Amino acid sequence: GLVSSIGKALGGLLADVVKSKGQPA
């Protein structure tokens, strides 16, 4: 459903942010 799609999108964004912060600058 729509809510599920939004949740997936937010989860993906969150994962990307966590990955970026985990990478050495």
From Swiss-Prot:
It is found in: Secreted. One of its GO terms (molecular function) is pheromone activity. Expressed by the skin parotoid and/or rostral glands. GO terms for cellular component: extracellular region. Keywords: Amphibian defense peptide, Pheromone, Secreted. One of its GO terms (biological process) is defense response. It comes from the Eukaryota. Acts as a male sex pheromone that attracts females. Has no antimicrobial activity. This is Caerin-2.3. The lineage of its organism: Eukaryota, Metazoa, Chordata, Craniata, Vertebrata.
